[in-house]
């Protein structure tokens, strides 16, 4: 009901902002589906019944990607990153040090091994080359930091990892958003690595920037995307001086309830930026930067 301006004979006429999001989602998916693959692989991990229901295979790597049901499932989990509930959770982790993120994963895996309730996370990493989503499955403490072992859908049969130093820097030495491209090292610090908990992707989802039936004010969505491969960024400043975005190379979010997310796509196009501002923010400036 939130996304439809009219429903006639069970046919939805979406609000213009929803059509814009759908167009953005389709454009992003043309660049790559790593987000959907990272989520689905985690959902299927250890669940032989669910895995067999797709194509009667024993491992994710054996799945035939041309299967329509599988493609639909991948696309669904890909677009969950557009949901406000997902963005709110991811934004809170984006503001944390990579060292703290590694420790969150270490604790979560320890709880899983004990048979206790655990969360499950996907990882998003960002660099000048683009964004990429991977699935962590183990963390080891090392001298000077941590090593996060990951499933990278571009290299499904190879062991990959992200090293995180005690001073909050990370490096993925074998990173490439496209398996046909030569791998090179990616690295970063606070604001370039995030965790997204699986619980946030379960729904139901809400549309805080859609017209509200209750008459309450709606939030504001701001998005920017480049036509080439150069990453763009948004700098938001409210009329009271609160900031959101990257300032002097560091991620800043001084606006309660606001979210900032790069929509992970692939190497051929820049990752679009999607910003949500709560209804309380009525006046603001938005500057686009490379």
Where are these regions (language model features)?
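Active-site-adjacent structural segments surrounding the nucleophilic cysteine of cysteine proteases
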Residues: 1-68
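Surface-exposed intrinsically disordered loops and tails
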Residues: 4-12, 113, 178-183, 205-210
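Short linear interaction motifs
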Residues: 12-25, 101-106, 114-124, 212-218
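Extracellular structured ligand-interaction cores
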Residues: 29-35, 118-120, 131-134, 145-147, ...
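Conserved active-site-adjacent core of cysteine acyl-enzyme catalytic domains
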Residues: 40-131, 141-142, 153-155
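Short, flexible beta-strand-to-coil junctions
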Residues: 125-130, 153-156, 224-229, 288-290
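Active-site signature of cysteine proteases
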Residues: 127-199
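Extracellular glycoprotein-like low-complexity segments
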Residues: 200-290
């Amino acid at each position: 009901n939130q996304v439809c301006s009219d429903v006639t004979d069970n046919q939805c006429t979406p609000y213009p902002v929803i059509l814009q999001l759908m167009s953005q989602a389709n454009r992003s998916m043309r660049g790559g589906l790593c987000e959907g693959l990272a989520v689905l692989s985690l959902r299927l991990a250890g669940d032989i019944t669910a895995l067999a229901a797709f194509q009667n295979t024993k491992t994710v790597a054996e799945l035939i990607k041309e299967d329509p049901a599988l493609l639909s499932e991948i696309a669904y989990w890909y677009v969950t990153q557009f949901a406000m509930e997902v963005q709110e959770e991811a934004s809170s982790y984006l503001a944390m040090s990579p060292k703290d993120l590694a420790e969150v994963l270490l604790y979560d895996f320890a709880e899983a091994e004990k048979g206790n309730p655990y969360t499950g996370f996907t990882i998003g990493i960002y660099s000048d080359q683009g964004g990429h989503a991977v699935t962590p499955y183990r963390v080891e403490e090392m001298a000077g930091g941590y090593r996060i072992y990951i499933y990278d859908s571009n290299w499904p049969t190879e062991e990959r990892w992200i090293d995180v130093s005690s001073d909050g820097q990370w490096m993925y030495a074998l990173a490439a958003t496209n398996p046909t491209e030569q791998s090179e090292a990616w690295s970063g610090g606070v604001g370039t690595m995030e965790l997204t908990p699986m619980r946030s992707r379960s729904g139901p989802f809400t549309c805080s920037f859609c017209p509200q039936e209750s008459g309450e004010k709606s939030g504001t969505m701001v998005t920017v995307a480049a036509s080439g491969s150069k990453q763009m960024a948004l700098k938001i400043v409210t009329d009271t001086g609160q900031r959101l975005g990257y300032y002097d190379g560091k991620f800043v979010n001084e606006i309660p309830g606001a979210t900032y997310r790069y929509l992970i796509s692939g190497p051929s196009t820049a990752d679009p930026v999607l910003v949500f501002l709560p209804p309380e923010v009525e006046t603001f400036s938005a500057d686009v930067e490379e």
